[in-house]
Amino acid sequence: MPQFRSNENPMFRSKFSEDIFKHKYAHHGCETWDALAFTLVDDVCQDHLSKDDKDELKRMITDLKFIPGGRYLYYAGRDNKFFNNCYLLKAEEDTREDWADISWKSESCLMTGGGIGVDYSVYREEGRILQGTGGLASGPIPKMQMINEIGRRVMQGGSRRSAIYASLNWKHADVDKFLASKNWYDMPIGETGFSIGQVKEQDFNFVAPLDMTNISVNYDTEWLLNYWKTGDTGDVFRTNVRQALRSAEPGFSFNFFDKEKETLRNACTEVTSEDDSDVCNLGSVNMGRIDDLKEFADVIELATKFLLCGTLRAKLPYDKVYKTREKNRRL
């Protein structure tokens, strides 16, 4: 098979990678990868870095040694500067107001093109009496489904699917329902004789519960100490393992001792936090393009400078995210 080489973008090693760039990231003024790299560095770094640093960053990005997160690439040179890929949200109070607020925060974040993760553990279980308004609580799972449907309708730029993560503590009274909440093959569609899972095999876009959402169970210090004491992981964990082996979900979120409150995750779960409205700030170093340890160190240093500039330049969806970014300033 002849080796692929593009005249416009010679740094790409396959037509597939160039097609992704053209479909997702190329836009006016950034029609080629090197043009995007130059525009992006000038847009993000402005006067915060020296000309030499910016020139070297442009070369590193052009050569695919350092690749900023996808939102950096998408918003390079655009009027809005939503450079952050994801946001970490927390249901903070078991109240009607917080229930509504988490929807507003989720939609505000998703409309920038960033993904979200939400810990719903504070919400009361299904069926508990509501003293203030009367009736019975619906529990956290319907709220997860509401956020899932917001994500279904928020297609940033008309082409980007929302990325969503949801978690629940292992002691929550609704955890058994949560564990089975994506068992689509156990969910019949009326009298058709088919399950949601069977139909979704044929039509990827067929609507299914939490189909836009990755889910995980949170395990805390109490769970760990009980395991150390008794050697028993407990029914919830065993069911979680069976589910994960069967369908890959739910996953596992382990938060112990001084990190016990860091239950928040972004949609891809590489960032952890205990602070509501936290934000991730992503870039990747492509070691396959780097020749030696010295070059690796140089790339890391300039990539760090670039991402720090991003924390000064990036626009955010609402005020609390600015405050949390100022506190944590994550890279």
Give names to the regions the model predicted.
Residues M1-L331:
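Extended catalytic cores of very large enzyme megasubunits
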